[in-house]
């Protein structure tokens, strides 16, 4: 797979708490130049990006990020504001405590509630695999499928681990046919980019892809 094809699968990501407007502009410009699938950025920058770049960029943002603890009502409010500001894609974090309490139906209902708000736009569900057992991961595959979300996503990039090949294989076995996979966290080499796409990931969340494919040494998410 050539570099251009790889980058069409990349959500060019900048979610560091110290991200400046100059940092954000850099990834916006790179997204336009290299035709990435989207940029994934903090919600506070959505309006400014939309005002500056218009429809040249597909904007993704995060909700309930990175811990997932906020209430469903809070996540709905975040989502509504993000969409009003110009986001086209929402990456939400589930309440991991609900998973640990085996309140799987509650997680499903929260995802469903956000999908109702998102409508025809894209909802990706971050399940933070590094904290879950295999049983819990399978339960979340079912929850994401039943709730009608568009993607299941491995990680925030702020947890104790990121995407693994084993988790991608597990997802493929247990998600429904309409659910796609996004790998994020630890996608740090060109080999990783190719491996996850070849394994069936439709999206990759990383800040490193453009630099890696340009042959640069990079650090980040």
From Swiss-Prot:
Q: What is its main location?
A: cytoplasm
Q: Which reaction does it catalyse?
A: 2-deoxy-D-ribose 5-phosphate = D-glyceraldehyde 3-phosphate + acetaldehyde
Q: Which Pfam families match?
A: DeoC
Active-site residues per Swiss-Prot or TrEMBL entry: 91 (proton donor/acceptor), 153 (schiff-base intermediate with acetaldehyde), 182 (proton donor/acceptor)
Question: At the top level of its lineage, which domain of life is listed?
Answer: Bacteria
Instruction: List cellular component terms (GO).
Output: cytoplasm
Q: Which GO terms describe its biological process?
A: 2-deoxyribose 1-phosphate catabolic process; carbohydrate catabolic process; deoxyribonucleotide catabolic process
**EC numbers on record:** 4.1.2.4
EC main group: lyase
Subcellular compartments:
Cytoplasm
The pathway it acts in is:
Carbohydrate degradation; 2-deoxy-D-ribose 1-phosphate degradation; D-glyceraldehyde 3-phosphate and acetaldehyde from 2-deoxy-alpha-D-ribose 1-phosphate: step 2/2
Q: Which keywords label this protein?
A: Cytoplasm, Lyase, Schiff base
Q: Name the Gene Ontology molecular function terms of this record.
A: deoxyribose-phosphate aldolase activity
Recorded hits in HAMAP family, A to Z, give:
DeoC_type1
What functional role does this protein have? Catalyzes a reversible aldol reaction between acetaldehyde and D-glyceraldehyde 3-phosphate to generate 2-deoxy-D-ribose 5-phosphate.
Q: Which family does it belong to?
A: Belongs to the DeoC/FbaB aldolase family. DeoC type 1 subfamily.
Q: Identify this protein by name.
A: Deoxyribose-phosphate aldolase
Its organism's taxonomic lineage begins at: Bacteria, Bacillati, Bacillota, Clostridia, Eubacteriales
Q: Which gene holds the coding sequence for this protein?
A: deoC
């Amino acid at each position: 797979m050539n570099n251009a094809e790889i980058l069409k699968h990349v959500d060019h990501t900048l979610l560091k708490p110290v991200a400046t407007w100059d940092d954000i502009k850099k990834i916006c410009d790179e997204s336009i130049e290299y035709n990435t699938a989207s940029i994934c950025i903090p919600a506070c920058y959505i309006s400014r990006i939309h005002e500056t770049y218009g429809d040249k960029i597909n904007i993704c943002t995060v909700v309930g990020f990175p811990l997932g603890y906020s209430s469903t009502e809070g996540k709905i409010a975040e989502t509504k504001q993000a969409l009003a500001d110009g986001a086209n894609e929402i990456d939400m974090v589930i309440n991991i405590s609900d998973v640990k309490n085996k309140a799987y139906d509650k997680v499903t209902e929260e995802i469903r509630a956000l999908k109702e708000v998102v409508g025809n736009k894209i909802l990706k569900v971050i399940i933070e695999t590094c904290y879950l057992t295999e049983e819990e991961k399978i339960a979340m595959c079912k929850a994401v499928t039943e709730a009608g979300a568009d993607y299941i996503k491995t990680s925030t990039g702020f947890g104790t681990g990121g995407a693994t090949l084993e988790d991608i294989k597990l997802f493929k076995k247990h998600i429904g046919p309409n659910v796609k996979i996004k790998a994020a966290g630890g996608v740090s080499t060109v080999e990783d980019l190719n491996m996850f796409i070849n394994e069936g990931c439709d999206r990759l969340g990383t800040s490193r892809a453009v630099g890696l494919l340009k042959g640069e040494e990079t650090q980040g998410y």
